Regions:
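Intrinsically disordered, metal-sensing/regulatory segments
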Residues: 1-248
Length: 248
């Protein structure tokens, strides 16, 4: 349980650190924003495949259980995509002002996409703590924490530029960080239920992260004409996770 609390504190703290740094970044060019998200996407791709799905196959002879877990994780995120709150409840602006601010609507949809994937990210870290392999356990947690810092910066700057108050923006970032903590506890609880269930949960967390990376993060990085920079940043993120897993 100590490892779970350490993982939760690390991931939550990394998101908040990124958010604080974001207050000092008044204007983040799309080129850098796409590169940062591409780097985060690379870490998530590596963490979901090398840190979760591959170990899941190695821990059981029932490969179909892992496949079911991967597909269930993707479907879970697909359903979450359909269940999003009214954006003006989050920003604190009245509905009319929100309708007239197309930039804010786009920013909030982007922030919601990041918030939604914090839950499966946390589940991935929580489930990996249940894994018998220490490298897998800390590799996934370190990888997610590393990408939480620039991701936190990416959340804060656009919100403030769109007119959301600094106080509300900071509380939004804290809420997003707490979603990840909830995911860690949920993932650890489900992964600890039985040794047979653990590979399914590893697959579930991996599938959810793959879905978010493909459906939300990569398309966002390719939407502003800087896809080459984002692609190389993704490769750098993937390599970072591989090297980090070897060193942990």
């Amino acid at each position: 349980m100590t490892n779970v609390l350490i993982s939760a504190a690390g991931l939550c703290g990394a998101t908040i650190i990124g958010a604080i740094l974001g207050f000092f970044v008044k204007e983040l060019p799309h080129k850098w924003k796409d590169a940062v998200l591409g780097y985060c996407a690379g870490i998530m791709l590596a963490a979901s495949t090398l840190g979760l799905i591959v170990p899941a196959f190695e821990q059981t002879g029932l490969w179909w259980l892992v496949v079911i877990g991967v597909m269930a994780g993707a479907l879970f995120l697909n359903v979450l995509d359909l269940v999003t709150p009214h954006l003006h409840h989050i920003t604190g602006l009245d509905p009319e002002e929100h309708r007239n601010n197309a930039r804010l609507s786009h920013v909030m949809l982007f922030v919601m996409a990041i918030a939604l994937h914090k839950l499966p990210e946390g589940m991935a870290a929580g489930v990996s703590v249940c894994s018998a392999e220490g490298a897998t356990e800390w590799g996934v947690s370190f990888g997610i924490a590393l990408q939480n810092i620039p991701e936190g910066m990416v959340i804060i700057a656009p919100l403030m530029m769109a007119g959301v108050s600094a106080t509300r923006t900071f509380f939004i970032s804290i809420f997003i960080a707490l979603l990840e903590v909830a995911g860690i506890l949920l993932g650890f609880g489900l992964g600890s239920a039985s040794s047979t269930f653990l590979p399914v949960m590893l697959g579930f967390a991996g599938g959810a992260m793959l879905y978010v990376t493909s459906d939300e993060m990569i398309p966002e990085t390719h939407a502003h004409g800087f896809q080459k920079q984002a692609t190389y940043a993704l490769l750098l993120g993937f390599i970072t996770f591989v090297l980090m897993e070897k060193c942990v």
